[in-house]
């Protein structure tokens, strides 16, 4: 009854107006699953390959017809008739069918669309939510949201070098309280920025993109908004950063174009440590560049016992890179992005490896998103306790938050908000 009878791929648009892949998987019993694939702006060099057409006469070369054709043709031919509940087996078949180390032949965007739609179809067939299908009966932890309320770097047209400034409501009791807290701070920040004469345009992930001179200036505005909204910085609401430092790591140095400063590897680690000391910062993602292994070890030794250090470009949701990082004492947490690796099975393997090593895991969106809310279910399914899915504006971001509200309501008394305990690695 759960045999795959049809797979339909199509080209749709993401939140930036660029094409991406959407896939429907239809089963013999009439069940159907749909998934849309996200896309990143600041991408790690070691991510699985997103296949683009390169035909400049369509979408400036960013079309995904080749990936869609792979879904409708070669992939369906290979897995049509297989049992949708055999997720690991089908994912392995897709990896072997592609035959490359980075999924570059068929495209990770084609493979991931099928992999996620497959899980949704199987859940639909069993008439259970996706988080329950993937995570079983123990899936009940609602994650602390990392809400990106100030955008910089490649996500915004402003001089701020760091890419994301986030708030984490760690001191509230429920996810719905966390969302309300974030929304109130977001709107307070809008008023404070306007009052100070800054624009309140938003970046790719829905956060404000004001012309501020430095990370410190952005953090000061956020601290003020937290207090003005009636919350206590550090107690009710903690801060998190994503410098995305690979983007400004040049010739062994960190070149801050907006600030007009250059920092050595040691100075970069010291700068992050000072920020974490001066502000209630509990998490820093990609504070060092993806290939700056010396810097990662340095900053981990320096503040890894008191601050969550998340590897995104460093690990790219890849168990080989994660295992190497664990062995060598780099970071203490991994960012989980399904499209960095390309299948649900490999995504879950990365989460499991992190847990076994005592690392935390943060489920994450990409800057180019869709209305697909799969990562909300995966955050609950894995009990990872943290989700990063943008600001409190733009419906592509709100879709994930709204799904978490539904899950919390569904779980009722069983629902448990992760709170500060989510940062167990520190």
From Swiss-Prot:
The active site is at 205 (proton donor), 337 (proton acceptor). SUPFAM superfamilies: Enolase C-terminal domain-like, Enolase N-terminal domain-like. CDD domains: enolase (cd03313). It is found in: Cytoplasm; Secreted; Cell surface. One of its GO terms (biological process) is glycolytic process. It catalyses: (2R)-2-phosphoglycerate = phosphoenolpyruvate + H2O. Binds a second Mg(2+) ion via substrate during catalysis. GO terms for molecular function: magnesium ion binding; phosphopyruvate hydratase activity. Its EC number is 4.2.1.11. The keyword Secreted applies. Keywords: Cytoplasm, Glycolysis, Lyase, Magnesium, Metal-binding, Secreted. (2R)-2-phosphoglycerate binds at residues 163, 337, 366-367, 388. It comes from the Bacteria. The keyword Nucleus does not apply. It holds the Pfam family Enolase_C. Its cofactor is Mg(2+). Pathway: Carbohydrate degradation; glycolysis; pyruvate from D-glyceraldehyde 3-phosphate: step 4/5. GO terms for cellular component: cell surface; extracellular region; phosphopyruvate hydratase complex. It is an enzyme of class 4 (lyase). Mg(2+) binds at residues 242, 285, 312. NCBIfam families: eno. This is Enolase. The gene is eno.
